[in-house]
Amino acid sequence: MTGQRAEKPVLRVLGGEAVWPPPVWLMRQAGRYLPEYRKLREKAGNFIALCTTPPLATEVTLQPVRRFGMDAAILFSDILILPWALGQKLRFAEGEGPRLERIDGLAGLEALDPAALRQGTEPVMETVSRVRAELPPETTLIGFAGSPFTVACYMIDGRGGDFPLTREVAYADPALLAAVIETVTTATIDYLSWQIEAGADCVMLFDSWAGLLPPDLFRAHVIHPTARIVEQLRVRHPGVKVIGFPRLGGLMTLPYIADTGVDAVGMDTSVDPVALARLAPRRVAFQGNLDPLLLRAGGISLGQAVERIARGLEGHPHIFNLGHGIVPDTPPEHVAAVIERLRSLEPGELEESALAAT
């Protein structure tokens, strides 16, 4: 890692340093709540075009950095670009979310073309390179992918929801789920590696639906694939930092921390950050976990929550973020208020912080 990269606050935290005030970026910080995003979305015509047209995707990625001075930019894309690049048909229905042509057996999986992944994701890599060239030197660029289980949920069910087909397949046809996850895991290693080569400082794995699984399947389909991705990325890119987000993982977050090798764990809004830091089997950075609905609501409670979360993890490596993505009708001024409040906080007395005993 270069000296310049080491000076970036987010990377300092991912390296195990407690930085005050904690650096901040927000999941879905580039999105429909911003009027400048809505203009570009209309110009693109459809969501896939927005993700795969590098000048537009670059501009969308940079918008929240310019407006709010975020400490990190996260690549603007979608977790379903990966199966789409493999050959699975994808469309985004207005008001209904993504629709994939379902994989309902091994024949459907075998119809995908891993050799097409590089060409299919080349626009993403161009976007990473363009963003890298335009970011302020202190701003971290985060690449990302969906974690294998979460991507498999969409590939098998074909749409969002509570994924009843995928959950049934886990029991009725475990070989199919294992094969889909194997395909996605292998592709994700390449996909994230190419993002790093294109200029990403670190990467994040979004396992938005990890909490659907019972403990034995969580180990098999969340922990094990994540550990493999982390291991292989570090073989190719020694020292690269990885953030994992096992959303709604509950107590399984502890073995996730122990066994995956991630450098930071994203916390959803159900997590008590101080309790997790005390129970964690090894020292990792934490990311989160302001409620997106409180961000939308604003008011006195918003400022109080910002300070409570930040103070609770003072002295521990922490990246301030949300517990899930920004909701579309969030007032941008509420985001600005969070940044202002966070950066106005003076360092406290560490011996009095919530983690003093850890």
Curated annotation (Swiss-Prot):
Protein species of origin: Acidiphilium cryptum (strain JF-5)
Sites marked Transition state stabilizer: 78
HAMAP family per record: URO_D (MF_00218)
The keyword Repressor appears for this protein: no
Family indicated by similarity: Belongs to the uroporphyrinogen decarboxylase family.
EC number: 4.1.1.37
Binding residues for substrate: 28-32, 78, 154, 208, 324
Pathway in which this enzyme or protein is active: Porphyrin-containing compound metabolism; protoporphyrin-IX biosynthesis; coproporphyrinogen-III from 5-aminolevulinate: step 4/4
UniProt keywords, alphabetically: Cytoplasm, Decarboxylase, Lyase, Porphyrin biosynthesis
Source taxon at top rank: Bacteria
GO molecular function: uroporphyrinogen decarboxylase activity
Function of the molecule: Catalyzes the decarboxylation of four acetate groups of uroporphyrinogen-III to yield coproporphyrinogen-III.
InterPro entries: UROD/MetE-like_sf (IPR038071), Uroporphyrinogen_deCO2ase_HemE (IPR006361), Uroporphyrinogen_deCOase (IPR000257)
UniProt subunit comment: Homodimer.
GO cellular component: cytosol
UniProt cross-references to Pfam families, sorted A to Z: URO-D
Subcellular location: Cytoplasm
GO biological process entries: protoporphyrinogen IX biosynthetic process from glutamate
Taxonomic lineage of the native organism: Bacteria, Pseudomonadati, Pseudomonadota, Alphaproteobacteria, Acetobacterales
SUPFAM superfamilies hit by this protein: UROD/MetE-like (SSF51726)
Catalytic activity: uroporphyrinogen III + 4 H(+) = coproporphyrinogen III + 4 CO2
Name of the molecule in the record: Uroporphyrinogen decarboxylase
